[in-house]
């Protein structure tokens, strides 16, 4: 009798555990479905992110660093704290405010608030176009050397960033889904929406720990229809890329 009671208890316990596992499994599946549904970007842009290593790999990364000329630009990808180091000056964002430190006053030419994350955005394409507070709109393709490149316009909701009226348009290869062009407006000074787009060609890419990041970009001139024609200036080259899942101390920024 005692053995029978113990057996019944054991069966009950095992049954409860199995039910708990099923319930846990259902919750995990529901969570996975919920996470998929959270994505706000269009399916085509999801393919662009995938062509560049995948949005999940990007989100796991903690630190991104690269060189532009004599500047070393380092970013905490989760907080978006940034440091731009040069032999004669440093500037950045510590999570609260933009700062500038110079060996000699006037060494840095430009506006720190405008410049501190400018090249981070150009370099972190296309992944920064998955940030929160973004609206997407399919736009007409642009044409260059016989190829039409489909595009999506990216605009920001009010009070997102220092220039919420800035707009971006990403153009991608229709076959490989690799990003090819970026059109963007600048509203930092005017604080008003603009339809004047600058155009950048992403010439070369490289694999950095599984993520496909830019190695060289070139600003282009456009015709009246908005299609690229010829380079407007020499190429900008990025070197010594690093992306890591290890965080840097807050004091670094």
Where are the predicted features?
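Bacterial signal peptide processing site
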Residues: 17-19
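C-terminal motif of bacterial Sec signal peptides marking the signal peptidase cleavage site
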Residues: 12-15
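Gly/Pro-enriched, hydrophobic low-complexity segments
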Residues: 150-251
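Sec-dependent signal peptide recognition
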Residues: 2-7
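Flexible, processing/modification-adjacent segments and terminal tails
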Residues: 41, 100-166, 190-194, 247-253
């Amino acid at each position: 009798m005692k053995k029978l009671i113990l057996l019944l208890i054991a069966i009950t316990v095992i049954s409860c555990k199995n039910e708990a596992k099923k319930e846990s499994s259902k919750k995990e599946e529901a969570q996975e479905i919920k996470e998929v549904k959270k994505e706000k970007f269009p399916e085509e842009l999801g393919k662009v992110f995938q062509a560049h290593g995948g949005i999940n790999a990007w989100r796991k990364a903690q630190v991104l660093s690269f060189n532009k000329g004599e500047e070393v630009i380092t970013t905490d990808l989760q907080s978006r704290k940034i440091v731009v180091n040069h032999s004669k000056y440093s500037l950045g964002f510590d999570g609260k405010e933009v700062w500038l430190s110079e060996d000699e006053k006037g060494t840095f030419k430009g506006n720190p608030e405008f410049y501190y994350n400018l090249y981070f955005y150009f370099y972190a394409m296309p992944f920064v176009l998955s940030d929160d507070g973004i609206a997407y709109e399919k736009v007409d393709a642009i044409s260059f050397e016989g190829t039409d490149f489909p595009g999506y316009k990216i605009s920001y909701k009010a009070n997102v960033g220092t220039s919420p009226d800035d707009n971006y348009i990403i153009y991608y290869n229709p076959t490989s889904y690799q990003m090819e062009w970026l059109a963007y407006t600048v509203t930092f000074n005017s604080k008003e929406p603009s339809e004047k787009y600058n155009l950048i060609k992403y010439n070369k890419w490289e694999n950095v720990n599984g993520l496909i990041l830019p190695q060289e970009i070139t600003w282009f001139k456009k015709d009246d229809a908005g299609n690229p024609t010829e380079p407007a200036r020499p190429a900008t080259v990025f070197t010594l890329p690093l992306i890591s899942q290890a965080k840097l101390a807050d004091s670094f920024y």
